[in-house]
């Protein structure tokens, strides 16, 4: 008898094969393993002898496909394997679900409980099954208890999430396909050359932010400022104090220092403070990506992928969450009990010692209605490869740190007053009284200072000092992690999409890795410049952030999907009108960028000349440099050549500026 030959069952659709297996094993002690089209699926019976077939998808099985031409507004959902050759592997999953849907009594979407999971399951059931017979399973971890609870509490389809997801797909498709085709058509009509180019609703403002930042760095000229350091002899101590005052002119700093030398100082106040250093809340995805990047240098995209693997292995809760909270419905004690039976036993013993066995989660500010903060499930990890272990260890330690206790620090602060002079300054040292969570989540360091013992009324003398010159610094280059933080602060994308968007920009050769930093390529530079110049609305962060807010409102049922899509089409029409006016200029700019037509190059780089034999950036650098030299002269009293040498030798000086300075020095 073929046990896989069944009918009259309910079809449960999981997002991935690992998830399908976990669901089957949670719902039955002996699930029947079957294979068809080279894909595994499982059959189970419940206590009422109802049959269930658990089948995996492979993520999205459907994608949007529109007509050729420009502009395009309409698209239909088509099987991915038909419209994308790189997704041909999804055909066997499509065939399996299609064949199993024919004999199903009903359908259960058990894909990840987020916007994408809701859309994946909805489209599969709508196109291959019967959406009128569909239900939803919602869980935050692939543990037996979570899956059983979700199975017992099956609900109606989450249409607000589905509508928000479909709106996001349609809007991203509308902007991506039309802006990309506009760029390619402009180039093809002008230079008779077809080149694949792309732009998008979220990726374009992100690219422009990196490019604008890089331009400002290349144009940066450090300016001098001055501070004063003094050496104070008091009791047996020789204290090196940096006075908290800045001077624009060196003469002012020297005059200030001369007045201080040999002055008496007196301790006028001693303050002892004990403060708590609060333990951290559990991770949301962005926090995890930032910490993994800071500690291990792992890219946000890879952090997300590794976390998803750990989730599918049943080791952590669902990672694509914005929440920093763990609700009371989740048993902290059971999780800790599970970790006690793993390699984390010593750490659990330490947490128990710190808390006396009473565990209270440090709840964060951010929340997510769909999922709690990322936390270990309590299942013991076994033989994890190094990359997985690093992420799991971060999550486990962060969770245990969040249920331990705040650290306790003491700060001793001495206020010293200079006699016959309007200046007070402080000297302090920090001591750790109780480490608590710092011993659990040991990735956070607190520096203890060498103690200083002074009393009120103690006197000393300023015996020496010096004037320090410091140069202003440009903003730091973006790393993948800092760019992710900028995207979050600008409300661009979601916690589930930001890391992937950064990787897309690298894959399309708009950005490239430069050590731990990312910088624009020549192509990325030109694309950003063209979008900035001709289509500023597309790269306006406010427009994209506003759209993200509207999509969130769909998810909470506050606005209709159709209204948001209509609004985007109106904005797209405005873009198309602007494009028609600038089409030839866009084509010419792209042709120049790709080297398809000859240009008169800047004497310092490959960009087109703008004025005086210079591109517009080197010309701007020259103008800024002339102004900066005058500021240097006023502040330092240096001669012209010395100023140029100081600017040239500074690591902060931008590339465009250095090119101009080098030429000026060679001409003197």
Curated annotation (Swiss-Prot):
CDD domains in the cross-refs: TOP1Ac (cd00186), TOPRIM_TopoIA_TopoIII (cd03362)
Pfam families associated with the record: Topoisom_bac, Toprim
Domain of life: Archaea
EC number(s) given by UniProt: 5.6.2.1
Keywords: Disulfide bond, DNA-binding, Isomerase, Metal-binding, Topoisomerase, Zinc
Biological-process GO terms, alphabetical: DNA recombination; DNA repair; DNA topological change
Co-factor(s): Mg(2+)
Sequence positions that bind Zn(2+): 602, 605, 615, 618
Gene3D superfamilies, alphabetized: 3.40.50.140, Topoisomerase I, domain 2, Topoisomerase I, domain 3, Topoisomerase I, domain 4
Disulfide bonds, paired cysteine numbers: 4-34
Catalytic function, reaction form: ATP-independent breakage of single-stranded DNA, followed by passage and rejoining
Keyword Coiled coil among record annotations: no
Temperature remarks: Optimum temperature is 75 degrees Celsius for topoisomerase activity. Optimum temperature for decatenase is 75-90 degrees Celsius.
Function text: Relaxes negatively supercoiled (SC) DNA in an ATP-independent manner at 75 degrees Celsius. From 50-85 degrees Celsius relaxes negatively SC DNA; at up to 100 degrees Celsius it unlinks catenated DNA to form circular double-stranded (ds)DNA molecules. The promotion or prevention of DNA linking/unlinking is temperature-dependent in vitro and probably depends on other factors in vivo. One study found single-stranded binding protein (SSB) does not enhance its activity, while another study found it does. Binds single-stranded (ss)DNA and less well to Holliday junction (HJ) or forked DNA.
Subunit structure, as described in the record: Interacts with helicase Lhr-Core.
NCBIfam families given in the database record: PRK05776.1, topA_arch
Protein name (record): DNA topoisomerase 3
Species this chain originates from: Saccharolobus solfataricus (strain ATCC 35092 / DSM 1617 / JCM 11322 / P2)
High-level lineage: Archaea, Thermoproteota, Thermoprotei, Sulfolobales, Sulfolobaceae
